[in-house]
Amino acid sequence: MRAIWTGSIAFGLVNVPVKVYSATADHDIRFHQVHAKDNGRIRYKRVCEACGEVVDYRDLARAYESGDGQMVAITDDDIASLPEERSREIEVLEFVPAADVDPMMFDRSYFLEPDSKSSKSYVLLAKTLAETDRMAIVHFTLRNKTRLAALRVKDFGKREVMMVHTLLWPDEIRDPDFPVLDQKVEIKPAELKMAGQVVDSMADDFNPDRYHDTYQEQLQELIDTKLEGGQAFTAEDQPRLLDEPEDVSDLLAKLEASVKARSKANSNVPTPP
């Protein structure tokens, strides 16, 4: 893994130097877009609306458009000048019971690795969080965005690792405006009892290893079948028509034009004496 951020956790008067790593990776199969007619790869170009030129990535800039249509350019230097952007500190704001953080607020997860010769301060904070069953609510800047996050320790069996889970801001969570749930619904005791029995019959401890992404597995089987069945092609292959009937009328028109052009050329050749 490659660290995406380095800094330190500000824990009272103690600083805990850490490296930050992405804790998750998407396992979905990725597709390329191709032209259905001949399997040619689709390429997108960045075109300037003002001059019509194709713009290279290195020539791109950012701008913000206000509600009344005015725009201001925001440069990399502008971003770098912000105090929060320059900070390399994960500031602990408070320690809260782990149960207080609603899972709906979780966004992304990151591993924290000690970034010093001694891991004592790291282990001290990790053990404190574990024994108090609390999370630290922290504040830091990552990838040009101010983050509110929950810092906790997770036991991976052979080691305890501190993790940061970035949280959504309150205004990023939508209000579930479902008036139908405001209606009074009568649930009979027998119905509630029966539903409870169903839950009891399916009750178990959560073990994520017993579940698999069956869609991705089936999709991979489909791809493997096509690869092994001679349906594969490479990007260097000459694009080919795929089961599309030839436009005979267009071909005939081209042949007729060729004959006429050849006849005209022959008629202009002087007859030898």
Curated annotation (Swiss-Prot):
Residue ranges annotated for the Ku domain, each copy included = 10-193
Read off the Pfam families from this record: Ku (PF02735)
On whether DNA damage is a keyword of this UniProt record, the answer is yes
| Domain of life from the UniProt record | Bacteria
SMART domains noted in UniProt? Ku78 (SM00559)
Which UniProt keywords are given for this protein, alphabetically ordered?
Answer: DNA damage, DNA recombination, DNA repair, DNA-binding
Location of the region described as Sufficient for interaction with LigD in the Swiss-Prot/TrEMBL record: 111-273
State the Gene Ontology BP annotations.
DNA recombination; double-strand break repair via nonhomologous end joining; positive regulation of ligase activity
The record's GO CC annotations read:
DNA helicase complex
GO MF terms held by the record = double-stranded DNA binding; protein homodimerization activity
The free-text function statement in the UniProt record for this protein reads:
With LigD forms a non-homologous end joining (NHEJ) repair enzyme. Binds linear dsDNA with 5'- and 3'-overhangs but not closed circular dsDNA nor ssDNA. One dimer binds for every 30 bp. Recruits and stimulates the ligase activity of LigD but not of T4 ligase or a human ligase complex (LIG4/XRCC4). Attenuates the 3'- to 5'-exonuclease activity of LigD. Stimulates the template-directed addition of dNTPs by LigD on 5'-overhangs and nuclease activity on 3'-overhangs.
Q: Which family does it belong to?
A: Belongs to the prokaryotic Ku family.
| Subunit structure and binding partners | Homodimer. Interacts with LigD in the absence of DSBs, and with the isolated Pol domain of LigD in the presence of DNA. Interacts with Sir2, possibly in a trimeric complex with LigD.
Put simply, this protein is called Non-homologous end joining protein Ku
**Source organism per UniProt:** Mycobacterium tuberculosis (strain ATCC 25618 / H37Rv)
Taxonomy-wise, where does this protein's organism fall, top ranks first?
Bacteria, Bacillati, Actinomycetota, Actinomycetes, Mycobacteriales
